[in-house]
């Protein structure tokens, strides 16, 4: 049952060994330490707004200095209750306060019910974890209609009635006669879960602690322990005789602590309050699926906070207008989720507390809540230098504004076309650089979080790519649902394709902007020096970078990852920051920097020889574009475990490269290989390094060749059409009458489809290609493949400039996307390049198929709203692959699914 913020909401135990030298004491007997005089550069904490002594103890253990009660400039401000928006607006960038504006949209019972109802209408299968709820008096009529339907079916249900903004179990009652409820009061009526999961015949709920460190971008952490709060009377299904026995039906600590049967125990596995850590072990001992249990809990939490995100982000932006995108969030929040389990162990959300109780009446409260607070403050990364850096940054920005630096000139009405193009290009470059800074800041933040998670784990953004895509889809739906008709700029920002791009993708776009800038300025085009595939040439500049990287990594390979040394450095004031400067020691960053600050290519130097470095002979190098299984070779002959290839596969590839591309493209993976220690895991001294590289290269080429043939066999068709009515004839018909269709396709792609819809069209191709790569390369995560990274760069180029990248492929030249490989240090082989060419052709076919379906549907009157880009695709085109032997077609599913299947092109696949 729900429990109220600000009250002793006592919950279960997890014995964290944070500091065993601080024995548990009841909050009434804890003595506050006398703080020494404030030192310069110390981290200050203003805790006058809390009544919980455990908060003060944790700040002291973190070595924070207690600020004066009236000090509004402290690094940390803690309040038990929600704070006014004006106070958040007045905070400086180095400060942190423990509440977000707008979080009441899920923490008030009536707001939670209202927002969940809206999301259930949009995503009923995803939001099925909250009991059916009505808000009185607004939904009184709907409730009475529901009661009448139950009577017709001769069914009777129990309902729980709560005050809309109540707490601590006050005003809660149960009823089985819904028709007797009155509409005057502001109440929340909810279906009662009659068959809960029981512990020793007692009903219970879980208090899950959640930390939100940022809303822009959203970052959520789940604490791996919490409290199990049990009723104090054995549970029986609700009936007219026991509806008033609240000690049986309610699990609130504030209610049950008054019962004489309430058991206070100093251990975590007995009493009326226990730890979730103990509960997890209990489930494991009884053969329950622990992994599924925690995944369900995490899923519930993330989906609930996705409902809050549009409200919170909008309110936060209103409080902090003009804040730099790379600035740290001044708000964080520790939330208490109250969750109940049914008999099938499915979690159901009861309520969310934005000010969960941090009272410590029992040892279990002290252990769990101290860990929640201590680990949360460590994750916030509050540093003494933040204040000084913030003041310096403010001064620099003030000087910029004073001298007019950093701001772009405005165009006059009389500006020429050249000036307009130049202005658009400069704006694009500024946008890309800003997003690049955000991505690098996010990478730095993630690296810090991974080192200081403690007993937390990050549940958003998740590591699983498919799960992240699902959550991003729900997030987009939430923004469309809750911010419809307002916050247009915020919605445009959420739909910006740059938000989903990685660092290397943004660097590619920046490089393209540099090339466009050169063309616009009339600079001579750079010569494209041919490179020989067999020799794998590398520039002397690249060799120098690689040597510096190797020596640096070897000298820092010991001790750099030691947590104790990091903490010592922090104590000495040497705050370790992850730098992503373009001149960083990492070779990958150096490689990317050469793409932005381009220089004419140097003469190719000889590649490394085994004799040039004594240590390199014993080391094993693995190509970053090849699955790990390829290099796990044994002493057997390489021909024994190679799969046979048909004559078609062994035949030469005859499609020529288009445009100015030549067969000089080589593999970038050779320059990215980093020597590994000779003593690492699976090194086979019987295979020389050159032999291993040769085998790896051969297998990569074979797998790339298989990928190319698989892509050539892919055909797109419109669902609902027979296999004979393959879409290819429709596409040919459009291309034959291109003069007629050109303007219509352009209007459809560039105007009617927004950026989200354009990405959905190309995602049809992307999803099927992922399945092909997973099948051929035998890897589940294709992100590690060099060829897939090349595909991603092509996809991003096709979506560039609001879809102009793909549209330019319909022109006579149609090779503008090839420029992303021209001067990139990541070199592509001819076969990989032909795969990219086939990918572009599939994207063009997919667009024409979607356009054809939209046109036919509109003419037939099947989908009158198809042209409105607000609507989702009613039907998604499918890809088929023909087997050369059987000729049977197998179509993929419509959106990303792990079960997409293709008929194998050859039996040995």
Swiss-Prot record:
Q: Which EC class, in a word?
A: ligase
Q: Which residues bind ATP?
A: 162, 168-169, 190-193, 203-205, 251-252
GO terms, biological process: cell differentiation; nervous system development; protein polyglutamylation
Q: Is Nuclease given among the entry's keywords?
A: no
The site (Binds negatively charged residues of beta-tubulin C-terminal tails) lies at 108, 354
User: Which positions does UniProt annotate for Mg(2+) 2 binding?
Assistant: 351, 353
Q: What is its EC number?
A: 6.3.2.-
- What is the name attached to this protein's record? Tubulin polyglutamylase TTLL7
Species assigned in the record = Xenopus tropicalis (Western clawed frog)
């Amino acid at each position: 049952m729900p429990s109220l913020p600000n009250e002793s909401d006592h919950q279960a135990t997890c014995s964290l060994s944070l500091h065993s030298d601080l024995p548990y004491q009841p909050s009434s007997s804890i003595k506050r330490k006398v703080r020494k005089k404030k030192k310069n550069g110390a981290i200050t904490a203003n805790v006058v707004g809390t009544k919980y002594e455990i908060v003060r103890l944790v700040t002291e253990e973190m070595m924070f200095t207690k600020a004066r009660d009236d000090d509004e400039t402290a690094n940390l401000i803690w309040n038990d209750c929600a704070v006014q928006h004006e106070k958040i607006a007045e905070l400086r960038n180095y400060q942190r306060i423990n509440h977000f504006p707008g979080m009441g949209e899920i923490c008030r019972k009536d707001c939670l019910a209202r927002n969940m109802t809206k999301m259930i209408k949009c995503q009923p299968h995803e939001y099925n974890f909250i009991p059916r709820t009505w808000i009185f008096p607004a939904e009184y009529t709907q409730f009475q209609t529901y009661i009448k339907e139950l009577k017709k079916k001769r069914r009777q249900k129990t309902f729980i009635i709560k005050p809309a903004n109540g707490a601590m179990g006050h005003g809660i009652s149960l009823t089985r006669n819904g028709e007797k409820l009155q509409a005057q009061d502001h109440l929340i009526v909810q279906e009662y879960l009659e068959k809960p999961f029981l512990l020793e015949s007692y009903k219970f709920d879980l208090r899950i602690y959640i930390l939100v460190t940022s809303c822009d971008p959203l970052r959520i952490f789940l604490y791996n322990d919490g409290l199990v709060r049990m009723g104090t009377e054995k549970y029986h299904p609700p009936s007219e005789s026991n509806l008033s026995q609240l000690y049986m039906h309610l699990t609130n600590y504030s209610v049950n602590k008054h019962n004489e049967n309430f058991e206070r125990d100093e251990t975590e596995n007995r009493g009326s309050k226990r730890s979730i850590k103990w509960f997890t072990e209990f489930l494991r001992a009884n053969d329950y699926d622990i992994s599924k249990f925690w995944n369900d809990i995490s899923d519930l939490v993330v989906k609930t906070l996705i409902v809050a995100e549009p409200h919170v982000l909008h309110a936060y932006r209103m409080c902090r207008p003009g804040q730099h995108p790379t600035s740290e969030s001044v708000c964080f929040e520790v939330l208490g989720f109250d969750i109940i389990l049914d008999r099938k162990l499915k979690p159901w959300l009861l309520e969310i507390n934005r000010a969960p109780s941090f009272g410590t009446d029992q040892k279990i409260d002290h252990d769990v809540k101290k860990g929640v607070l201590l680990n949360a403050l460590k994750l916030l990364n509050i540093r003494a230098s933040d204040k000084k850096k913030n003041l310096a940054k403010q001064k620099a920005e003030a000087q910029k504004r004073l001298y007019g630096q950093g701001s772009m000139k405005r165009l006059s009405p009389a500006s020429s076309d050249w000036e307009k193009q130049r202005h658009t290009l400069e704006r694009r470059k500024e946008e890309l650089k800003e997003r690049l800074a955000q991505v690098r800041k996010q990478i730095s933040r993630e690296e810090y979080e991974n080192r200081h998670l403690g007993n937390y784990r990050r549940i958003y953004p998740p590591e699983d790519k498919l799960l992240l895509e699902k959550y991003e889809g729900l997030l987009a739906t939430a923004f469309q649902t809750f911010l419809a008709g307002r916050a247009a700029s915020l919605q445009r920002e959420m739909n910006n394709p740059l938000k989903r791009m990685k660092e290397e993708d943004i660097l590619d776009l920046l490089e393209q902007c540099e090339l466009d800038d050169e063309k616009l300025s009339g600079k001579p085009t750079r010569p494209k020096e041919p490179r020989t595939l067999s020799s794998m040439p590398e520039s002397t500049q690249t060799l120098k970078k690689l040597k510096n990287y190797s020596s640096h990594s070897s000298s820092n390979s010991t001790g750099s990852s030691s947590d104790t040394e990091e903490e010592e450095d922090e104590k000495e004031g040497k705050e370790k920051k992850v730098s992503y400067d373009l001149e960083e020691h990492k070779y990958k960053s150096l490689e990317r920097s050469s793409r932005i600050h381009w220089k004419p290519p140097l003469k190719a130097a000889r590649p490394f020889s085994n004799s040039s470095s004594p240590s390199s002979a014993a080391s094993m190098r693995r190509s970053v574009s090849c699955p790990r299984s390829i290099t796990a070779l044994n002493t057997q002959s390489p021909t024994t475990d190679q799969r046979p290839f048909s004559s078609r596969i062994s035949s030469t590839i005859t499609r020529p490269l288009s445009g100015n591309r030549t067969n000089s493209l080589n593999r970038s993976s050779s320059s990215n290989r980093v020597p590994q220690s000779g003593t690492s895991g699976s090194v086979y001294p019987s295979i020389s390094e050159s032999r291993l590289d040769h085998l790896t290269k051969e297998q990569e080429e074979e797998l790339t060749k298989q990928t190319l043939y698989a892509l050539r066999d892919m055909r797109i068709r419109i669902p609902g059409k027979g296999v004979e009515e393959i879409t290819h004839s429709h596409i040919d018909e459009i291309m034959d009458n291109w003069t007629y269709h050109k303007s219509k396709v352009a209007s459809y792609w560039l105007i009617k489809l927004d950026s989200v819809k354009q990405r959905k069209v190309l995602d049809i191709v992307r999803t099927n290609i992922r399945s092909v790569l997973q099948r051929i390369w035998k890897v589940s995560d294709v992100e590690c493949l060099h060829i897939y990274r090349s595909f991603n760069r092509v996809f991003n180029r096709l979506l560039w400039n609001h879809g102009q990248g793909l549209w330019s492929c319909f022109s006579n030249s149609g090779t503008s996307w090839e420029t992303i490989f021209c001067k990139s240090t990541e070199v592509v082989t001819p076969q990989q390049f032909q795969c990219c060419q086939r990918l572009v052709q599939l994207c063009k076919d997919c667009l024409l198929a979607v356009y054809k379906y939209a046109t036919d549907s509109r003419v037939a009157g099947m989908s009158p709203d198809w042209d409105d880009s607000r609507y989702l695709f009613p039907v998604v085109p499918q890809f088929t692959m023909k087997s050369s032997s059987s000729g049977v077609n197998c179509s993929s599913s419509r959106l990303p699914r792990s079960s997409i299947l293709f008929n194998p092109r050859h039996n040995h696949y």
